Amino acid sequence: MFDLIVGVSNDAVNFLQSSVGAKAASFKTVLFIAGIGVFIGAALSNGMMDIARHGIYQPQHFYFAEIMCILLAVMLTDVVLLDVFNTMGMPTSTTVSMVFELLGGTFALALIKVNNSDTLGLGDLINTDKALSVIMAIFVSVAIAFFFGMLVQWLARVIFTFNYKKRMKYSIGIFGGIAVTSIIYFMLIKGLKDSSFMTADNKQWIQDNTAMLIGSCFIFFTILMQVLHWLKVNVFKVVVLLGTFALALAFAGNDLVNFIGVPLAGYSSFIDFTTNGAGSSPDGFLMTSLLGPAKTPWYFLFGAGVIMVYALCTSKKAHNVIKTSVDLARQDEGEENFGSTPIARTLVRFSMTLSNGISKVMPEGTKRWLDTRFRKDEAIIADGAAFDLVRASVNLVLAGLLIALGTSLKLPLSTTYVTFMVAMGTSLADRAWGRDSAVFRITGVLSVIGGWFITAGAAFTICFFVAMVIHFGGTFAIIALIGLAIFTLIRSQVMYKKRKAKEKGNETLKQLMQSNNNTEILDLLRKHTREELVKVLEFTEENFERTVTAFLHENLRGLRRAMGSVKFEKQLIKQMKRTGTLAMCRLDNNTVLEKGLYYYQGNDFASELVYSIGRLCEPCLEHIDNNFKPLDTIQKGEFSDVTEDIVYLLQVCRHKMENNDYEDFENELRKANDLNGQLSHLKREELQRIQTQSGSIKVSMVYLTMIQEAQNVVTYTINLMKVSRKFQLTE
């Protein structure tokens, strides 16, 4: 059950990304349609679980106890591993995780068996062909899906443009006919190929009459889509929702083995042992029965379908994974979830060079004509949507078509890889990756692809060790590992909720970017700015105190932790400035001229606060790391007193900003002036000590730096409060 929930939470992105990203219907409607597809796909599946029964290991050489050890290790690993990816919001392949977990667990037991046997070798116990085909699927899927996604979307955009409603008088019928025919073909070839009613005769008939079926469907659906268009029905929405249903159907029918194949193989093994193992011990009963195919009872399939639909509708982590994929494909610039990497920057530079080269040889008339087809200011995108219905349609139709063709041609294409890479290819063709966002989007894509390889490595390694522990630890180890898995899942859920609570401020930014009312935009921008600057003051307060305390107590770990926080906060500041600038662009000129300067000054002072903490922490860390002499008692006493006052000032300023209450702010101004006076006095005292040579020069240098940065913190905090008051002031 847990594996079904975490598995569906991750794989839901495959069939929900396009319809959710384009807002083809309300989220509940999309879930309802996908839920029907998932349930029908699961219920009609004939439950062939061959890969979990004998796809990786050779069961005729394994005893009942060994098989149960492998399968239990796989289940424990799979639940935890997929939950980690769901928490991170990273789409991965449940097929990859299951295959490599089976491989890791089997390899562990195979090593033990080979060591204890003179007749068996690893080749007799493990089937590595499946693992190699999965690795090959990553490379093949990435290349094929990305290229064709880019090509087909470019052609679709040239035909329809971003203002597609003006250019679909007759072309929409042909497009709809091709799209729906492709979806039907995909459902027959991939979605229903293993269904209980799909007999060998039915498959052969479809294969013999494929051309006739495709031709008939194309003619019928072309006429139907054209008629629907004349009746004012949005054909693109029909295509997107039908494509969502088809992918959900195929997912449930084909990927069900990833979730229930392993436990059902264990159940089948247990039934076989209890039925035929009389007089045999678990260590002496060979599992030859797993060589045969097993038909799963209908009630298991029905129950799996119900659980999958429940997980689809209730899992918050599924929404998190979908958000990652949608954000990477978003048409407009906005808050980017990924940073910049050297390889991404290199790829962007190479692409720009290539693009400039093509541009030089292309006729000017052709360039001007193409530019008219890609005018993004004419885009028809629903409120809150990431991209339009044309791209969503291409995503679903092309993904389904590629998967169906791959199945027919015996190419090892993965549903997860194809759907994700098609979406990335279409977004690139739509010029969604501009110069200001391309490096972040490419980093995100590379991170997801890297995660696929990490899934394989982590699944193999973790399951290998878990199987070893279970084999040698017995019942006690099983209980301990189950307890550890439960603890990990609970801890993951708690941490996820905390992280989501911290990200709640992003809701304000989302509302801001979706609003078109200037007054509302300004109010939301003020609220968003308060939320972000309060976080900066909270960071400054916490890490100023942490750095000083750690330095005075020679706590190297505390200083390293503070330095790590500074590096992370610098990235957040960059992101805050970028998203803030995008938000400012949505205000009218008069408001920008009146309030813009204060906004940008506030961001600059916030940035200076973070850099001041970094300049404070770095010499302190170096001093303690080199085991130099600590501050003397007088210096510690002086700076401890002033530190308490600075931390208190930061707390008061944070509360005032949080409550948007700037009354009696003059009290804080006077307090800040007093603190700067105290710090200047400490600086003069230390300079006097240097002149009399009464202390260590290294100690004096770091102490003077601490005083200077403490003054900077006080000054920048007050300046931040001043400009924040002016920005928040309503006239």
PLM features per residue range, with description:
Residues V494-E731:
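Cytosolic, long alpha-helical scaffolding segments
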